[in-house]
């Protein structure tokens, strides 16, 4: 009793590990351990090991099965099935499905994934499957699903009509194409992402095309502005030239009127001579002018008739002169010819020609519309 009590106290204080607890019990499994070893050696002597389990490194223990103290019954089936042969046994043969694996395969591979990888190429398409690392477990790898042309065609048809599948339709397609529901769901997810990338690329290309197209209207607008500037510049030069011509004609007309007025006011005795000389000069000047200048002069004459030159008293009376256009050009010329040569004799004639009427005729000759004059 004292020995057992001290042993319990020491067990509680020391807190031994599980192995020490197992060794504290009396050895019961010596006969079982020897029998399990004998059975394992006998099983390897037959030389009919299961090839699949021997080729997986994770199922092959490094040495004899370790049994601490007494062997447990749960470890015996694993020792029987996966215990290695003797040291001089030949290595297991390599199968074709082993060569398809990558050389950098890790030693830890669960039996479920191994069995799925073994059955995967047989139940899927004729294409060589490719392995991709599984994100869930670092060491385990799963095979990439390779779809046949028929499966891809049917899936593409369904995706054309429906981007998203309800669960009953997904189950129906999976049963029709001999696929799992998860494979159909993953394929549709990937296809939606691909469709999204394609649409984004098209939008970017369209945006770049619009940006390039927007540059051309800017250039066209700049060209239009340049053309407008050139047109306005040319129009300004032409209008300036026309204004200069009109101003020159207006100055000539005003000068002739000023000379006539000065002759009438300053030299009362010689008034018949000076207006006639100025009139003859104007007539000679008009005969040598071009049609463009004649039009300009006619325009300026009309402006004078409208009262542009408000300084001279004759211009104020010009609107009333338009009523006297009934005189023909021949009569006016005959009148001027009749007055100019026989000017001294006209003083003694019974017809009384006053200075005002003579000045009126000279003003009429200088301001008449040139379109009615035929020289």
Swiss-Prot record:
Protein's GO biological process: regulation of transcription by RNA polymerase II
Major subcellular location class: nucleus
Subcellular location: Nucleus
One GO MF term attached to the UniProt entry: RNA polymerase II cis-regulatory region sequence-specific DNA binding
Pfam families for the chain: Homeodomain (PF00046)
Entries under Gene3D superfamilies matching the protein: Homeodomain-like
Binding region for DNA: 140-199
Signal peptide: none
Region Disordered, residue ranges: 29-142, 193-223, 255-277
InterPro entries (UniProt xref): HD, HD_metazoa, Homeobox_Antennapedia_CS, Homeobox_CS, Homeodomain-like_sf
Motif Antp-type hexapeptide positions after renumbering to this chain: 94-99
One cellular component term from this protein's GO annotations in UniProt: nucleus
Bias type Low complexity, positions: 76-86, 106-124, 255-265
Record field: compositional bias (Basic and acidic residues): 209-220
Domain of life of the native organism: Eukaryota
Summary of the function given for this chain in its UniProt record: Sequence-specific transcription factor which is part of a developmental regulatory system that provides cells with specific positional identities on the anterior-posterior axis.
Family the UniProt entry places it in: Belongs to the Antp homeobox family. Proboscipedia subfamily.
Name used for this protein in its record: Homeobox protein Hox-A2
């Amino acid at each position: 009793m004292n020995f057992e009590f001290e042993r319990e106290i020491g067990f509680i204080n020391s807190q031994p590990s599980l192995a020490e607890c197992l060794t504290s019990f009396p050895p019961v499994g010596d006969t079982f351990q020897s029998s399990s070893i004998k059975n394992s050696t006998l099983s390897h002597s037959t030389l009919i090991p299961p090839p699949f389990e021997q080729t997986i490194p994770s199922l092959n223990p490094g040495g004899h099965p370790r049994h601490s103290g007494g062997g447990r019954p749960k470890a015996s089936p694993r020792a029987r099935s996966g215990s290695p042969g003797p040291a001089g046994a030949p290595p297991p043969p390599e199968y074709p499905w082993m060569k398809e694996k990558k050389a950098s395969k890790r030693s830890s591979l669960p039996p479920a994934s191994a069995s799925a990888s073994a059955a995967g190429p047989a139940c899927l398409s004729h294409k060589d499957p490719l392995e991709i690392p599984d994100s869930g477990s670092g060491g385990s790898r799963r095979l990439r699903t390779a779809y046949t042309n028929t499966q891809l065609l049917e899936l593409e048809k369904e995706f054309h009509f429906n981007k998203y599948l309800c669960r009953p339709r997904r189950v129906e397609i999976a049963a029709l194409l001999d696929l799992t529901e998860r494979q159909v769901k993953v394929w549709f997810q990937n296809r939606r992402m691909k469709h999204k990338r394609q649409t984004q690329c098209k939008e970017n290309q369209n945006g770049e095309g619009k940006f390039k197209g927007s540059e051309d209207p800017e250039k066209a607008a700049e060209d239009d502005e340049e053309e407008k500037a050139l047109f306005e510049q040319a129009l300004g030069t032409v209008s300036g030239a026309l204004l200069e011509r009109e101003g020159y004609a207006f100055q000539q007309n005003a000068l002739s009127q000023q000379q006539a007025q000065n002759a009438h006011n300053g030299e009362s005795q010689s008034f018949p001579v000076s207006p006639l000389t100025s009139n003859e000069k104007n007539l000679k000047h008009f005969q040598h002018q071009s049609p463009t200048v004649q039009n300009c002069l006619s325009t300026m004459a009309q402006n004078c008739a409208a009262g542009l030159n408000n300084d001279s008293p004759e211009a104020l009376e010009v609107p009333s002169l338009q009523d006297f256009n009934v005189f023909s050009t021949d009569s006016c010329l005959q009148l001027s010819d009749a007055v100019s040569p026989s000017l001294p004799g006209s003083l003694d004639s019974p017809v009384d020609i006053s200075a005002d009427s003579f000045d009126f005729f000279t003003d009429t000759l200088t301001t008449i519309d040139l379109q009615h004059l035929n020289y």
